[in-house]
A protein has these predicted regions:
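Short, Lys/Arg-enriched N-terminal segments with co-localized hydrophobic residues
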Residues: 1-3
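Intrinsic low-complexity, intrinsically disordered or marginally ordered coil/linker segments
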Residues: 5-198
Length: 198
């Protein structure tokens, strides 16, 4: 526990060569009945996993673009992390960067789904650099080597595809491609940024 520092609202701990900051309530010092725990531990959820993943990419690969989001639904939650090159192109899944990023992101998962038996199998957790246990309640953690839908890199791909005729309705001129892209949920600002790069 020597690697943890807590103040009123946040706490810090070291994991994977980095210092991470999470809400102070992630540190569990009592059980569900309020009795002090002999060995306190850190409990992270979907928001913390998304935040830690983004921090990892920004520190280790500042030249890459990263997004993170999380959702809660009946009986679970999910985290999606998106990483791409600075020009918006997909990150090569054979690259050292991708393998390291995907490995880190997946290390934060709370377990995995066993499709054969149709059950979710919780993992054993992991530990900080000084041995404090970390439990993750992020159930489904995904790492993607491309930008998320609606972002400017995704808008670049969409517009190029619309102009090149990669969609069922054939090639479109720029004006019609922009209208279609808006219909697909791309914002004016992301379309404008994409147009600068086409």
């Amino acid at each position: 526990m020597r690697d943890m520092k807590a103040n009123k609202n946040k706490m810090k701990f070291n994991y994977a060569g980095m210092t991470f900051e999470v809400p102070a309530e992630c540190l569990r010092t009592t059980d569900y009945w309020g009795k002090p725990l002999e060995t306190p531990y850190i409990n992270i959820g979907r928001k913390e996993v998304a935040s830690m993943s983004k921090a990892f990419v920004k520190k280790n690969y500042p030249n890459l673009l990263v997004w993170g989001s999380s959702e809660t639904f009946a009986n679970g939650n999910s985290v999606s992390v998106y990483v791409c090159n600075s020009n918006g192109s997909d990150l090569d899944i054979e690259s050292k960067e991708w393998k390291e990023i995907a490995g880190f992101v997946h290390s934060l998962s709370g377990g995995k789904y066993n499709g054969w038996e149709e059950i979710y199998e919780y993992g054993d957790g992991f530990v900080t650099e000084n041995g404090t246990k970390i439990e993750s309640w992020a159930k489904y953690v995904h790492c993607n080597n491309s930008a998320p839908h609606g972002s400017w890199p995704s808008a670049v791909k969409c517009l190029k595809g619309l102009i090149a005729g990669e969609y069922v309705f054939g090639p479109l001129n720029m004006e019609k491609a922009i209208e279609k892209a808006k219909g697909y949920g791309y914002s004016e600002s992301n379309i404008s940024k994409a147009l600068e790069l086409i």
